[in-house]
Amino acid sequence: FGVDTLLPASVRRGSAPQSGAVPENPMALLGEYQQFTRDFMEREDLPEVDAAMAMRAAGAPEMGKGGPQLFSREFFEAQMEVVIEEKVPVYAAGLGNPGPWMDRLHSNGTKVMAVIGKVKHAQQVVDSGIDMIVAQGHDGGGHNSPIGTFSLIPQVVDAVGDRVPVIGAGGISDGRGVAAAMILGAVGAWVGTAFLATEEAGIERFQKEAITESGDADTIVSRSMTGKPARMIRNKWADAWVAAGKEPLPMPYQSMISGPVMASGIKAQRKDIMPGFAGQGIGLIHSIRPAAEVMRDLVDGAERALADARFYS
């Protein structure tokens, strides 16, 4: 695909010409963009899906009428109440600072982690009382940082590593990546895509196959799914936004547009439509395996890599 800084203007926030800028009220474009979705689904011969299926594909649980809007403040607050009620042992915040919830989480004995992509965000969550930080670089799948993994980890370690443990993340798919994160100062590694391609992972089989069939240049960063930049396996839906020169709506509105396509792509088992999110370490993953086997290889590979590195000492 090339270097991410060469993304077309239509998929970079703030880079669209004034005539194509998103208005202050994104709902003003909702009708036009929903028609774009319908046209895309017809062109790709995708099956129709009901609203509930579309919401689930966009990441929302089933909710009755009058429930909170997807990805709204009320939506997240309702989810947090469940986390607290169930007294989960570990909670990881993927977007934002969990500071306002820290006292209630800690009173339950919950260990709280935050995934961050910049040094300033690391400093903010540490000041709020976080237990661990995951420094995830641009190589990572899903929502990620504009800063590369190898550059981000040591800077975060230098900034806050004396106050909380820092875990490295972003494109780490084997033991060598784990070792590299630790050499950069992290206490360990946060691995995502490698575990998506396991028998136990809760994604569709065809999406696991898409991971094992992809190579190093097969991921892109696009706002076409959620409205925030996210790394995913290249697909026709993301390409359609570039071709049309359209600027995706900000979160949470873009999920209203992409939800039907995501659900229909899953229903039709279309690797070219909904292959899913994945990091740049995807080219190291060649088969669907049991999670325990992946874990053993990560540990063994890290130990070998760290042992090999010692010949310089």
Which ranges hold each PLM region?
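Active-site entrance/lid segments in N-terminal catalytic domains of soluble metabolic enzymes
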Residues: F1-D162
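Conserved active-site-proximal phosphate/metal-binding subdomains
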Residues: T5, S19-E42, P146, S151-I167, ...
